[in-house]
Amino acid sequence: MTDPVTGADVITAVETNGAVSVYDNVVFACHPDQALEILGVDATQKEKDVIGCFKYSPNNTYVHTDKALMPKAKSAWTSWNYIGNSKAVGEEKPVFVTYWLNKLQKLNHPTDIFVSLNPSTPPAADKILQKMVYTHPQYTQDSVRAQKKVVELQGDRGTYFCGAWMGYGFHEVSYLNTFRVFLI
């Protein structure tokens, strides 16, 4: 959806294909910065003040089979493996973690499959299955305070907001907050 126009009782939206649709309610199940971008000039000051508090950082993400991005001792492997960070002294760089998908998602696969965020050295090229960039919320005192204020926006103008950013960033929180929207 692009260019939503909120009215007293309905929301008129221009779809990405140019079609115009009218809705009683719209649920923004996306990052708050994306919701503000969609709302554009129609975002209220209250929406800007509350959901505008959430900032995101990019994370270079690899799905791969390279065991070199895991702890050296296999006995130390867990579902989530904090490897360190990819920063030089005095630099602020993102955390480097590797998820062991076979354990995390109970994959019954003969090859160990991993997801690494922000590795200091990328996986070996022949072991990369996919590379992408994801953004993750950066929690600050302002964003934590804003989480409590999102409830004040729910249903105002027929718009609702939900997502993992309303809690600790986990998918389960996203599901819970989506469910709560449908209970309103």
Indicate where each model-derived feature is located:
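C-terminal catalytic lobe of FAD-dependent flavoproteins
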Residues: 121-184
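Mid-domain catalytic core of redox enzymes
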Residues: 2-135
